[in-house]
A protein has these predicted regions:
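Bacterial Sec signal peptide processing site at the extreme N-terminus
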Residues: 26-40
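Active-site SXXK
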Residues: 44, 50-51, 64, 70, ...
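Short, conserved catalytic-motif segment at the N-terminal edge
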Residues: 38-97, 117-119, 133-140, 421
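N-terminal secretory signal peptides and thylakoid transit peptides that target proteins
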Residues: 1-24
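Short, surface-exposed loop or secondary-structure junction motifs
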Residues: 72-75, 135-371
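Short, well-ordered beta-strand elements
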Residues: 384-385, 391-400
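Acidic helix-start/capping segments at beta-turn-to-alpha-helix junctions
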Residues: 125-134
Length: 426
């Protein structure tokens, strides 16, 4: 998006802003109230991007939250929760954040390390003995023939997707098919009697399926953050969702971040839409991801993709990491722990999608135009990131599948930079 387009978007916004729901006030970190600031006044170019995507019916609605360099929180929004309803999207609307759950799980592991109950290079098998005799597929593209693993899987490997584990959705090879046949699809809503009962059951099933690579040898996006949930549970002696609630969600003030919808939450949950290859065809609502599906009881808590959250809540979480582990007046973790979370801990010689990797999230390495940025995304197009060098955090909430089916992010990012006065070197 070039500067002329941004200026044109500003004109479009000023002419037609009244047709869309704009943001409320901004608040300052540390619990102190800020003067009321309209999102239109602070983020006019970003607001125009949201407005245009909704006006063109590419999305029913979108919500963005920004922790600005001056410490204020700014929320902008456009549209509704569904193409067929008139309930407006807002900072407290609810979204399935899928893999953005991974950053929360990574933070939970970090505070457990701060407690002295876990270390980065501890062998996973010391905590999950089911993993004591892992095997590696000799040719994962051809079959499940395997040999004993030569390398030891560690907590670092789980955090950075270098464990040798994979995802059922990461292709259609023999190993991925074995995951599907075993019911290892964490993060997806399921009935009251799922094939995989809980994290212990998942680990036992994973131990019987070969790894697709030696631990520490390659980056492969995977269920490793789900396995990390079991590590946290066993190392802490506290059920994984309870540990996350006590050590991350409660102190940050993430009151609307849940594993299952509570009574009354369904009215705030945005509909997920699936987009086909024919972009001219209207998207369809995904029935399998309905509010009803997310209200059912759950026994398998997915640290890799199970949370529902709001723009306000997730921005609060990102702001805590940006603010060296402090959420308002509450100390959630030590500054050095917050720094560790956003430190590149990939095994030497590896890259992850062209960059580094921290505690569950991607890191822009030196030389990248977004050097130092840390964050991750969700399957339905949600995105969250912090930029410590430029002192801001941001999150985008939409519900469009598959990921990047509606590529609003490529236009929103330069608009946010322009609104915040950030100049990047190409």
């Amino acid at each position: 998006m070039d500067r002329n387009r941004l200026i044109a978007d500003r004109r479009t916004l000023l002419l037609g802003a009244g047709a869309f729901g704009l943001s409320g006030c901004a608040t300052f970190g540390g619990g102190a109230a800020a003067p009321e600031v309209r999102g239109l006044e602070r983020l006019p170019l970003s607001q125009s991007v949201l407005n245009r995507f909704v006006a063109e019916r590419r999305l029913p609605g979108a919500s963005v939250g920004v922790r600005a360099p001056d410490g204020s929180d700014i929320f902008i929004r456009a549209g509704t929760l569904d193409f067929n309803v008139f309930d407006r999207v807002g900072p407290d609307s609810l979204f399935r954040i899928f893999s953005m759950t991974k950053l929360v799980t990574g933070a939970a592991a970090a505070v457990l390390m701060e407690d002295g109950r876990l270390t980065l290079d501890a062998p996973v098998a010391e905590i999950i003995p089911e993993f004591a005799a892992l095997k590696v597929a000799t040719n994962p593209a051809q079959g499940l023939a395997a040999r004993p693993a030569r390398n030891t899987m560690t907590i670092r490997h789980l955090l950075t997707h270098t464990s040798g584990l994979t995802y059922s959705i990461a292709g259609d090879g023999p190993v991925q098919r074995a995951y599907r046949e075993a019911g290892i699809t964490p993060g997806a809503p399921r009935g009251d009697d799922p094939q995989v009962r809980d994290l212990d059951d998942m680990a036992a099933r994973l131990a019987d399926i070969p790894l697709i690579a030696e631990p520490g040898a390659a980056y492969n996006y995977s269920v490793s953050l789900d396995v990390l949930g079991l590590v946290i549970q066993r190392a802490s002696g506290v059920a994984f969702p309870d540990f996350v609630q006590r050590r991350i969600l409660n102190p940050v003030g993430m009151d609307d971040t849940v594993w299952r919808l509570r009574e009354g939450d369904a009215a705030r949950l945005m509909q997920v839409y699936a987009y086909g290859r024919d972009r001219a065809a209207p998207p369809t609502a995904v029935a399998a991801l309905s509010a009803e599906a997310y209200a059912r009881p759950v026994t398998l808590y997915s640290g890799g993709g199970g949370l529902i959250s709001s723009t306000r809540d997730y921005l609060g979480f990102l702001s805590m990491l940006l603010n060296d582990g402090r959420a308002g007046r509450v100390r959630v973790m030590k500054p050095e722990t917050a720094h560790l979370i956003r430190t590149d801990i990939l095994p030497e010689g590896l890259t992850a999608e062209g960059g580094g990797f921290g505690f569950g999230g991607w890191i822009a390495r030196p030389g990248h135009r977004r050097q130092g940025e840390f964050g991750w995304s969700g399957a339905a197009g949600t995105q969250g990131w912090i930029d410590p060098e430029r002192n801001f955090a941001a999150t985008l909430m939409i519900q469009a599948m598959p990921y990047r089916a509606v590529d609003i992010l490529s236009e929103l990012r330069p608009a946010l930079d322009a609104d915040l006065g950030i100049v990047r070197i190409a």
